[in-house]
Curated annotation (Swiss-Prot):
Cellular-component GO terms for this entry: plasma membrane
Ranges of Basic and acidic residues composition bias in the record: 1-14, 24-40, 74-128, 203-226, 313-359
Subcellular location(s) of the protein: Cell membrane
Organism the protein comes from: Staphylococcus epidermidis (strain ATCC 12228 / FDA PCI 1200)
Protein name, entry field: Probable elastin-binding protein EbpS
Gene that produces this protein: ebpS
Entry keyword set: Cell membrane, Membrane, Transmembrane, Transmembrane helix
Matching InterPro entries: LysM_dom, LysM_dom_sf
Alphabetized NCBIfam families for the sequence: elast_bind_EbpS (NF033598)
Length: 460
């Protein structure tokens, strides 16, 4: 049985659609052999990716293997091209002997010492070194250009420059045998490369302004390329001194401009940091002031509340004291009224006792009417005569008493619910029974009952 028995009619009749085949065939004629291989692999991948109906089973596995091998080949080719380019660029790098490398190493160490001693003069020293030693060799210029970077960045650059300078020169003998014609051609090439470097350097400086974080990487790449190209220019200067000197001068001017741009960027960063510190310092001053104002406001509010509560408590205490005083006055008044009522009740009791005694006397007198009637009849005449005499004497005595009483007595008119005890307190200061009896005798009263509007005589 074949595999087609397991497929439906649609899968049996399917066909791959390759719309890019004609265009790729036209382009293949103009490419080289290497480009043809790459184009074939890419076309196979694109054709496989553009198929409307992807293959299954064995065909799919085959396509996966092809794509994997093509991708690995492409990566190997790219890596080989990059390595070839690096070897071609570095073919003219190492033209210095070991004595020159040692001198350069010593100079870089001295420059590191001076950099640690004076950080403020670092910028000026970098500019002066770029002007004076403009025609010197590129490794020296490379070590001086790194002086303009303060802090650990400059040290890292110098360490890398020392490591690049310490590489052994492998092709020194072969390069020393080259003639004057080759040197002249190299000089012309060095001048051309300095001009090319000028344009590349401007583009890199623009990218540095747009992105400060990639500044270190771009600076490292610039320094490496400058060192390589400076070495090429120095080789060409042996045959074409004029062209080489012009290229070196142009290179020094570009390095100077590059250092000034870096210094301006660093100054801008320092200014930004100082402005950030000023803003932070202002906020540090402002926040404690706001906190102190809030605390003082809270203290003032709580103090006012405490004073109000204190005043309220004082007023409440005063009200309570006044109320207690009024209550005590009411109690005293009630007690005095009770005492007066008790005294009046006792007087009433005494009066009732006296009335009882009078009744008893009247009873006793009525028990012997017959005995007394005879005596009365006998003494009627005597009594009449005595009565007349007594009336005369009583009138005389009463007149004399009235005259004496009117001379040192006062009168009082009864109003409201007054009684003899209150009147005695008003005139004598004490409501005793003796004072009440004095008023009763002066007014001829037999009881304590008095009525409203009655005029009483108050004796002295």
């Amino acid at each position: 049985m074949s595999n087609n028995n397991f497929k439906d009619d649609f899968e049996k009749n399917r066909q791959s659609i390759n719309p890019d085949e004609q265009q790729t065939e036209l382009k293949e004629d103009d490419k080289t052999n290497e480009n043809k291989k790459e184009a074939d692999s890419q076309n196979s991948l694109s054709n496989n990716s553009n198929q409307q109906f992807p293959p299954r089973n064995a065909q799919r596995r085959k396509r996966r293997r092809e794509t994997a091998t093509n991708q690995s080949k492409q990566q190997d080719d790219k890596h080989q091209k990059n390595s070839d380019a690096k070897t071609t660029e570095g073919s003219l790098d190492d033209r210095y002997d070991e004595a020159q490398l040692q001198q350069q190493h010593d100079k870089s160490q001295q420059q590191n010492k001076t950099e640690k001693q004076s950080q403020d003069n670092r910028m000026k020293d970098g500019k002066d070194a770029a002007i004076v030693n403009g025609t010197s060799e590129s490794p020296e210029h490379k070590s001086k250009s790194t002086q303009n970077r303060p802090g650990p960045k400059a040290q890292q650059q110098k360490r890398k420059s020392e490591s690049t300078q310490s590489k052994p020169s492998t092709n020194k003998d072969k390069k020393a045998a080259t003639g004057a014609g080759i040197a002249g051609a190299a000089g012309v090439a060095g001048a051309a490369e300095t001009s090319k470097r000028h344009h590349n350097k401007k583009d890199k400086q623009d990218s540095k302004h747009s992105n400060h974080e990639n500044d270190e990487k771009s600076v490292k790449n610039d320094d490496q390329k400058q060192s390589k190209k400076g070495k090429k220019a120095a080789v060409g200067a042996g045959a074409a001194a004029g062209v080489g000197a012009a290229g070196v001068a142009h290179h020094n001017n570009q390095n100077k401009h590059h250092n000034e741009e870096k210094n301006s960027n660093q100054n801008n960063q320092y200014n930004d940091q100082s402005e950030g510190k000023k803003k932070g310092g202002f906020m540090k001053i402002l926040l404690p002031l706001i906190a102190a104002i809030l605390i003082l406001g809270a203290i003032a509010i709580f103090g006012g509340m405490a004073l109000n509560n204190h005043n309220d408590s004082k007023s409440d205490d005063q009200k309570i004291a006044n109320q207690s005083k009024k209550d005590s006055d009411k109690k005293d008044g009630a007690q005095s009224e009770d005492n007066k009522d008790k005294k009046s009740d006792s007087n009433k009791d005494k009066k009732s006792d006296s009335d009882k005694n009078a009744d008893d006397d009247s009873d006793n007198s009525s028990s012997n009417p017959n005995a007394t009637s005879t005596n009365n009849n006998d003494n009627v005449a005597n009594n009449n005569s005595n009565y007349t005499n007594q009336n005369q004497q009583d009138n005389a005595n009463q007149n004399s008493n009235n005259q004496q009483a009117t001379q040192g007595q006062q009168s009082h008119t009864v109003y409201g619910q007054e009684n003899l005890y209150r009147i005695a307190i008003q005139y004598y200061g004490e409501g005793t029974q003796a004072n009440v009896d004095k008023i009763k005798r002066a007014n001829g009263l037999s009881s304590n009952n008095i009525h409203n509007g009655q005029t009483l005589v108050i004796p002295q």
